[in-house]
Amino acid sequence: MNPKLVIFALATCVAGLSQALANPQVQMGIYSPASGGNYRANPNAELEWVLSNYVTGKSTDGTYFGTFCIEKNEYFSNGGTYDVVLNNKAISGGVSSPTAGYDVISKGTAFLYTQFATGMLSASYYGSAANAAKLQDLIWWLEGEQTSWGAGTYNSLLLAEFGANWQVDARADYTGSAVKVMNLTSNQGRTQNQDQLVYVGVPDGGTTAMMLGLGLLGIALANRKSRRG
């Protein structure tokens, strides 16, 4: 294998990744049974790769994906389009935002959203506005946005996952990479809007292509050394 061709292919993958993440945006909407979440997000071309991580008919309708907000004191307009930065934390806003200016999402939030996105919640959940509201309440509690959660059964999922001490352990900082926060802004970044959750899977968008390119480069260099030997 020609090393120059491999390096060119790798550079193309990296350039493609940079272009894909150049200007991601979402159009936000209110709850829709077709999308499954408390809110819905329609990604533009630069972010639509996330749709493949959701389950059609449950957490996505193929165009929108269901999402939940993690800040109670910031907002979005129904039908509004917002710039997106993928992060692991809410920025600035939020009732519980610390003096550092950001708030890392909790393990419990990441767990519940993963269950939602991958279609693992009970069949009765999907398409129910009432159940979506209950799950949103629990996520707000996990994120310190309110002091209690509404009536529902989703806290039983946290008990099963985190054990008897779930009310403490589920609120610990999430250190994984499958669930991200969409930091939403408008007015060219001057206005901070309500941050939302997104499931990017593991590895997240573009990483697979980069890993493949690096793997091919490694094979090419190894072959070159063996020929010299």
Segments from the language model and where they lie:
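Short, charged juxtamembrane terminal tails flanking transmembrane helices
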Residues: 226-229
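Sec-dependent, cleavable N-terminal signal peptides
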Residues: 1-22
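A detector of low-complexity, intrinsically disordered, Ser/Thr/Gly/Pro/Ala-rich segments
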Residues: 5, 10, 61, 79, ...
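Helix-centric, low-specificity signal for extended rod-like, repetitive segments
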Residues: 12, 127-129, 217-218
